[in-house]
Structure formats: C-alpha cells, structure tokens
Amino acid sequence: LEKAYPGRGEELAKKAKELTLAVYKKCADYALERGIIIADTKLEFGLDEDGNVVLADEVLTPDSSRFWPVAGYEVGRSQPSYDKQFVRDWLKANPDSDYKLPDDVIAGTIEKYKDAYKLLTGEAFRDTGI
C-alpha cells in the first residue's frame, strides 16, 4: 500500500484492518447466535472520491466465507459447511471432470446456501426465478 499511496499506505492498512475486525466481529456474533460459525472470510476495500476507505464487493456470502454449523463442531477435523467447500471437495475428488459440475452437486450447493440463509434470517429463501 505504501507504494500505491505514498505517505498513506500504513494509515490505509490500519483502517482496513480495523474495519475488517469490526465487520467480522459483528457478523460472527450475529451468525453464532443463529447456529453458524464464520470460520473465515475475505473483505475488500477501496477508496471513495474523497479518499475514504469503503467496503466494496460482496460481504460475508457463502462464496467469500466459510460457514460451519455450530451443531457438531469439533476442533481438529474437517467441518461440514454451508459454503462453496462442497464444490471444492467434489472437484478435488473428481480431477478429470473438466470442471463440469453434475446437477446433484449444483443442487446440493444451492441447498447449502439456502440452509445458511434460513439460519441467518429466520426465513425460507424465496426463489424469484431470476
């Protein structure tokens, strides 16, 4: 950051870190109360036209985070998840797939995302058909 923003790199990195930890803590606490552990996530930041650090891109989705169910969580073992790990595991087990996912893997991934949605919102996901 120092190369990209001479004189501001350290300040911007500190601000991004503070924002990352604040967003993660608030969301992790919210999710934990609803039965989900947010194991990790990625957040992306940018600068607005006034040079302020702003949160950008997707935030805490199953594509950018690992969501584990609290029920059954055990330290030191692979965890079931409500995220794209399901797809990664299938691809790892099927290296000759040419990255074409079978319908059951796609459907399973959709169900995992819907399960996470329901736990986090308390409502069933309504498919709009879009």
Regions from the PLM with identified roles:
Residues 1-12, 60-120, 125, 130:
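Anionic ligand-binding catalytic core segments
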Residues 7-39:
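A long amphipathic alpha-helix within ATP-dependent nucleotide-binding catalytic cores
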Residues 38-59:
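Conserved metal-phosphate-binding beta-hairpin within the catalytic cores
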